[in-house]
Each structure stands twice: as C-alpha cells, then as structure tokens.
Regions:
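Ankyrin repeat domain, specifically the short helix-to-loop turn at the C-terminus of the second helix
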Residues: 72-84, 108-117, 153-160
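Hydrophobic alpha-helical targeting segments used for export or membrane insertion
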Residues: 8-15
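Ankyrin-repeat boundary/"N-cap" motif
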Residues: 26-29, 35-67, 87-97, 120-140
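Boundary at the C-terminal end of the N-terminal hydrophobic targeting segment
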Residues: 22-24
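Bacterial N-terminal signal peptides that target proteins for export
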Residues: 1-8
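Terminal, low-structured helical/coil segments at or just beyond the last alpha-helical repeat
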Residues: 136-160
C-alpha cells in the first residue's frame, strides 16, 4: 500500500479516535491502534510506537490535500493533553519535524500551541544532539543550501 494512502488513512483514523468515534476496525486495517487507549501514542503492536503529534507532523508533509485534517488531529491531540514537545525515536519534537520538512505554517502552528523552540534535541545522532530549533534550522540551511528555508527562518525568528 502506498505511503501516502497509509498516511491519509492514518490521519482520518486518528481524527476519529481522538473525537471518540468508533473507528477501531478501520484503524486495525492499517495495523495501528492507540497504545493503551491513549490518544497521544500509536502502535502496531509489533514494536512500532510513535507519539501522535510528531507522527502527524510527518503526515502533514505528505498530505498536501488533507493538511486541514492533519491540523485537526494535531489540535485534538493537544486538547487531549498530549505533550506538544514529545519527541520521536530520533529525538525530533513535532517542531523539529516541521522544520526538517520545511513547513513554515506547521512551525507557526506548533509555536502558537506552545512548542518550545529552545528545547534541545536529545539524540544518538551527534550531528543534531543538543541543538535547539534555531540551531537545527541553521544546520539544515548549511547542509542543504539549495532548499529555500527563508520563510521558515522568518517564522522562527518571531519566537526568538
């Protein structure tokens, strides 16, 4: 199944779960479920587990037509008490993921929701370990200079 289809289905399923709809059969068809009925974490029951918000940051990058749905899932997770700064297994918070994917609107959304741009990445990857959002953006701008991140920098600078 194409990743875009899985991500689209996941966004819809998580939205349903977070709004207390009975979508467990559909979510199961993608091999995912909430972990211990916690809307803040998703699992496949075989070792994959990820924080809902950072997973949706990745879905936002992939779903150009369904970004509104992804934002609704993110907002529902935040309203359910999920940690806006909870990192994934690489140490990326949702804000870091949005920076990596070069999504200024999503960066703005996370910052307005209370994401901490000064939170340091804790990662086994030495190149990113200890960087805050500003330093991470600087690293990306130097490593991939042909990708325009000027709008992203403008958003982040408003929160410096």
């Amino acid at each position: 199944m194409p990743a875009k289809t899985i991500a689209a289905g996941l966004a819809i399923m998580v939205c349903g779960l977070l709004t207390n709809n009975a979508w467990s059969d559909s979510l199961a068809s993608f091999g995912l479920r909430t972990k211990d009925k916690n809307p803040c974490r998703l699992t496949d029951g075989r070792g994959f587990e990820a924080p809902t918000i950072v997973l949706m940051a990745g879905a936002y990058d992939k779903l150009s037509k369904d970004k509104v749905v992804v934002l609704e899932v993110i907002d529902a997770a935040i309203n359910a008490g999920c940690d806006i700064d909870e990192p994934d297994e690489l140490g990326f918070s949702p804000l870091n993921a949005a920076i990596l994917y070069n999504e200024p609107a999503l960066v703005e959304h996370f910052l307005q929701a209370g994401a901490d741009p000064y939170r340091r990445i804790v990662s086994s990857r030495a190149s990113i370990d200890g960087l805050d959002a500003f330093e991470f953006l600087h690293l990306l701008m130097n490593k991939v200079p042909n990708q325009d991140r000027t709008p992203l920098r403008a958003v982040l600078e408003r929160y410096q």
